[in-house]
Amino acid sequence: MTFSIVGRCAETGQLGIAISSSSIAVGARCPWVRAGVGAVATQNVTLPALGPQILDLLEGQKLDPASALDRALGSNGWSQYRQVTVIDSQGRTALFSGQEALGQHNAVAGEQCVAAGNLLAGPQVIEAMVQAFENTPGMLVERLLAAMQAAICLLYTSPSPRDS
């Protein structure tokens, strides 16, 4: 199971990512942030090269997040197994959740954020993350952590497909 959120503070322009996974070394493979450019989370049969590639397209070629994501996914194989979320320095978002992502999976864009997850108890986990981010006042880190807490609460209150 992996769930993540990329977000931006509209007041400061600060970018950030919060991610949790059952996979080892998730922090070395999945979250990518470049100050003044954007944030990218790659997960589910992840290809770590996608993060820097998308950030390079945002920065060097001045592509919008959707175009950068499409180009990066188009140049790599196995995209249907991946989940990728992107936010740029202007707060524009893009997301991809391949049909072959593991278990119940979902990806949702919100105001200044985008979240995704796989092997979930249900799609409501990601929806709750976005709602928590949007409804929590304060600094970006507080909003990212509120989103993670919302997901964790649902993990322990929602029936899991593996429980049957």
Show the residue positions of the predicted features.
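Alpha/propeptide regions of enzymes that mature by internal proteolysis
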Residues: M1-L155
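Conserved small/polar residues in nucleotide/adenosyl-binding loops
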Residues: Y156-D163
